[in-house]
Amino acid sequence: MLSYQDKAGAFYKDNARANSTKLSLVTEEHGGRRPPYLLFVLLVLLVGILALLAITGVRFHQVSTSNMEFSRLLKEDMEKSEAVHHQVIDVLTPLFKIIGDEIGSRLPQKLNEIKQFILQKTNFFNPNREFDFRDLHWCINPPSKVKVNFTNYCESIGIRKAIASAANPILLSALPGGRSDIFPPHRCSGATTSVGKVFPLSVSLSMSLISRTSEIINMLTAISDGVYGKTYLLAPDDIEREFDTQEIRVFEIGFIKRWLNDMPSLQTTNYMVLPENSKAKVCTIAVGELTLASLCVEESTVLLYHDSSGSQDGILVVTLGIFGTTPMDHIEEVIPVAHPSMEKIHITNHRGFIKDSIATWMVPALASEKQEEQKGCLESACQRKPYPMCNQTSWEPFGGRQLPSYGRLTLPLDASVDLQLNISFTYGPVILNGDGMDYYESPLLNSGWLTIPPKNGTILGLINKAGRGDQFTVIPHVLTFAPMESSGNCYLPIQTSQIIDRDVLIESNLVVLPTQSFRYVIATYDISRSDHAIVYYVYDPIRTISYTHPFRLTTKGRPDFLRIECFVWDDNLWCHQFYRFEANIANSTTSVENLVRIRFSCNRSNP
């Protein structure tokens, strides 16, 4: 007997086989016939293939036709280009050669003939008198029977252009980097170090004179765009054999050239020697545009007369070109032209510059106009706070109770006009030190930096912005303040105290560097250590930082003169320094002139 499960399994297995057999029979039955829709699909596929073949054939034909057309056009263009090339070679090149020959040889000859014709006609109509081109009003309305002669003027202009052309290669080697910054970049996060070195002057005229035991009493130096100028009083030992006086005035000018190891060297190219007379005892200096200019007087204080009652003293004008024996070497005495309210000017050690053929200096001046305004500024400031200057009863450099003003001296150097010294004045921050004003060129077009040196360690000096244009203004820049008690345009210089620093025997002039960013330098003769030293202070007011570097001296003495002039060379600070001192042991006066270099570097920089 089979169990229930065996029966059930047998039943389902048999049933499954029966069903499978039945299905296979059905499939074989349907496989013998094809449905009509399958034939329709095959027909559509055949038609599509034929259509694609037809489209491909048409596109291939079009591409072949386009390629043939492009080849034909390209061949035509190449034939035309070849024809143009032959036309240029065969026709235009000989034509250009003919034109060049005509312009190079015939045109100058024709122009010379026209020039000679004009000169002949001019000489014919103006037969009697020579004409000085510097009288410009004669050009506009010339007098009758005046012979026009442009020879002197044209020669002067031609010489200036030739000198500029000859000097340009020398200046190009010196100018790169002349206005770059000397300080480490802002990203410097470590300590800033300075390294200094002293270099002797080897090819300068003054150094050759000093080496012959001649004594230089004082020296002014100015440097501008690769050119330097000097003036100084010289007392050589053998002067009795050459001049009747005990001192001679020397002017020299030259280039700053690259020397060994790319260091700067002051090479003299032209100089002038004058016997020290009544007009060359005190001289200023200005350098620029390959020219040196100087104003010389007998006494520092020059009285200005505006009527016939007084005899106006003249001022000696000296100009010197970069190369010798040229019209720029000139000596002439001129009568200054000043504002009627001006009474005096005070000329001492003044450094100016030449720009647009105009030499400009700044000097202390005394004017009667607007005195009450200046006095009111000081009185209002002193009412509530006793500033050290409030107790002054005499004002430098003229003395008395009148406050000095700022005077501007301008001297046009254009060959087309006569030499004329113009003096104007204006007021600005109160002047406490009347010994010297310097004027430095500014990147701004119509202004410069006017500096007044410090004094006795109590007066820090002044740096103002002074205009060069018709409107002469002096605007405070640094080292001044506006008292709260005063109103209007009232500024006072910073005065620390009345206690004199005994360790600082003398302070130099205040120098503004020719960098794009505002920087200034000052030097002092310091005896605070066992070795005497000249200490340089370099200031960056924008970043409110300053750096110092001392140069130790091998000698000791009491200095009576210290003057510096600084410039930038290969991103380093270079300064020409001249100082005189009386030796403690020998009791003799010694003059020292040299170059110093200060290199600033950063120990660590941020990336």
From Swiss-Prot:
This is Hemagglutinin glycoprotein. Pfam families: HN. Binds canine SLAMF1 at the cell surface. Its main location: virion. InterPro entries: Hemagglutn/HN, Sialidase_sf. Residues 59-607 are virion surface. One of its GO terms (biological process) is symbiont entry into host cell. One of its GO terms (molecular function) is host cell surface receptor binding.
